């Protein structure tokens, strides 16, 4: 038990150092990838981080004096930021209403649009090419264990990115995501949808930021279950095509700023 107690103290001290110091987040751009493949990959990373934490949790619950190395503990949970574009797909959150899907299966298949019920929060949304989909896999125990604050930070990343393009993004009370003119009745338009899942404070899923997205796909759903409000894109707001690489760089820079992290890249 003495070994277990020392490991728990070490785990708490290192977590404190992580909070005080700038943490590193491994960035991976997955390119164009099927939704299910990206979902499975997120689950793989999440479960690996949970496995690394599970030894410490078992010690805290008095499971014995198991000896572990710091290479197999919570001390080495790895943060990730994944960027991806998906072929056309509708995804429905676990609290979503299937009635917000306005297209039948036959027509959806004919148009080549996939459909998945997911384990994230939120309702129905669309993912497609020329949309920056970001999946942060973060251990919130090394940040703040507050889902609300985490969602607000994701929103802030996109709000700052819009500001880089001279666009005022904002929040809409009670509606997670990023909007333009949320207070102007009849002109409210959503530019970024957000839906996440956490397990043992490890996050997955994330945000979908419309850059040059084909907005016609949103005509066949009630986006996020919110009727009578529009969806927009960076292209539509600026009146021109936007360079995707440029937009990604801006999102990455603002992610580092808001979360106080440093993105690192694999060679």
Feature roles, as predicted:
Residues 139-141, 197, 210-212, 237:
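Solvent-exposed residues in well-ordered beta-strands and their adjoining turns
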Residues 196, 201-202:
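Acidic/histidine-enriched ion/cofactor-binding microenvironments in catalytic or ligand-binding pockets
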Residues 179, 215-267:
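C-terminal accessory segment of soluble enzyme catalytic cores
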Residues 202-210:
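Conserved phosphate/anionic-ligand binding catalytic regions in large, soluble enzymes, centered on
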Residues 191-194:
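Histidine/acidic-rich helix-loop-helix segments that form or flank divalent-metal centers
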Residues 7-19:
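Short, Lys/Arg-enriched N-terminal segments with co-localized hydrophobic residues
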Residues 16-186, 242:
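N-terminal lobe of the biotin/lipoate ligase/transferase fold
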């Amino acid at each position: 038990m003495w070994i277990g107690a020392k490991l728990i103290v070490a785990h708490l001290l290192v977590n404190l150092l992580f909070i005080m110091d700038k943490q590193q987040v491994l960035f991976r751009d997955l390119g164009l990838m099927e939704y299910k493949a990206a979902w499975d990959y997120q689950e793989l990373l999440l479960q690996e981080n949970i496995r690394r934490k599970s030894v410490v949790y078992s010690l805290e619950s008095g499971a014995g004096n198991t000896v572990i190395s710091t290479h197999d503990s919570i001390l080495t949970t790895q943060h990730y930021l994944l960027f991806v574009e998906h072929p056309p797909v509708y995804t429905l959150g676990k609290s979503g209403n299937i009635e917000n899907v306005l297209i039948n299966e036959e027509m959806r298949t004919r148009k080549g649009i996939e459909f998945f019920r997911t384990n994230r929060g939120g309702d129905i949304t669309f993912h497609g090419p020329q949309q920056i989909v970001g999946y942060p896999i973060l251990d919130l125990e090394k940040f703040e264990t507050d889902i609300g604050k985490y969602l607000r930070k994701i929103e802030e990343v996109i709000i700052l990115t819009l500001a880089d393009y001279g666009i005022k993004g904002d929040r809409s009370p009670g509606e997670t995501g990023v909007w333009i003119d949320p207070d102007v009745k009849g002109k409210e338009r959503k530019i970024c949808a957000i839906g996440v899942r956490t397990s043992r404070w490890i996050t997955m899923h994330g945000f979908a930021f419309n850059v040059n997205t084909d907005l016609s796909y949103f005509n066949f759903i009630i986006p996020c279950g919110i009727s009578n409000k529009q969806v927009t894109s960076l292209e539509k707001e600026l009146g021109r095509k936007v360079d995707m690489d440029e937009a990604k760089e801006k999102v990455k820079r603002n992610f580092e700023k808001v979360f106080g992290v440093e993105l690192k890249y694999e060679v």
